[in-house]
Amino acid sequence: MSLKLPIAVSMIARNEAHNLPRSLGSVADWVQEIVLVVNDCTDGTEEVAQGFGATVITHPWEGYRDQKRFALAQVKAPWVLALDADEEVSEALKADIHAFFHGDHEWFQGAMFPRKVWFLGRWITHGDWYPDWSLRLFRNGKGHWSGSPEHDKIELDGSVKKLRGDLHHYSNPTLNSHVEKITVFGDYFLQRQIEKGRPWSLAETLLRPWWRFFRAYVLRLGFLDGFPGYYIARATAFATFVRYSRLYENEQQTNHPSRSA
């Protein structure tokens, strides 16, 4: 058995017992530490994680970004691999990470790699969803969680190496689960636009959905992913249209409160 790498997996979870065997199973035998921060679990998430040797910490929900910040603060290992419960380190990525640590990792502060989504029975390898380069491996103390509530990301000062192995992502097991996210992300978008004081624009409402479809399906070759590629481009365009339409709705409700009551 090879020695474990000086890496801690940092993860947050709520009712992820069904996903943890895949995600933690892909790393448990070669990382030094697993830190899982949980909240409000009712499905045995804690017990499943402990079966993989994870340190499980219960912490009240603070939102995705801040919850991940708390999890990161609990890590002791020299390096951190930040994962979501619905992700899996592929064999190719595992090999790349091992090669990185047995090679030139001392010259870098972190590493990024492509994230590949399993959707509608196939891997998505084109369009807006791929390669989705993700910075997830970094020196402890050098990276921190930043970004917006729905698009949190690691920010890092220093050089970053690109690895080629894919991080597998099982984020949308059904069409229903994807459609539900349109409303959730629409809420975040509306809140951000209101905070910025940005007015509704008819031009953006009409043109942005068209552009998002054209970019995903044509420029980024989404058509090569068959019907799933077409669905993703269409759904992205529709989600964009809904977001800007909700901004219009909010302005109407603000300007005419008595009529919208």
Predicted regions and their residues:
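N-proximal low-complexity "stem/linker" segments adjacent to membrane-targeting elements
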Residues: 1-26, 256
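Structural signature of the Rossmann-like NAD(P)-dependent dehydrogenase/reductase core
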Residues: 8, 38-41, 121
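Acidic helix N-cap motif at the loop->helix transition within catalytic regions
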Residues: 21, 43-52, 92-93
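A conserved acidic beta->alpha catalytic loop
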Residues: 26, 38-47, 61, 84
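Conserved donor nucleotide-binding strand/loop of the catalytic core
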Residues: 32, 46-76
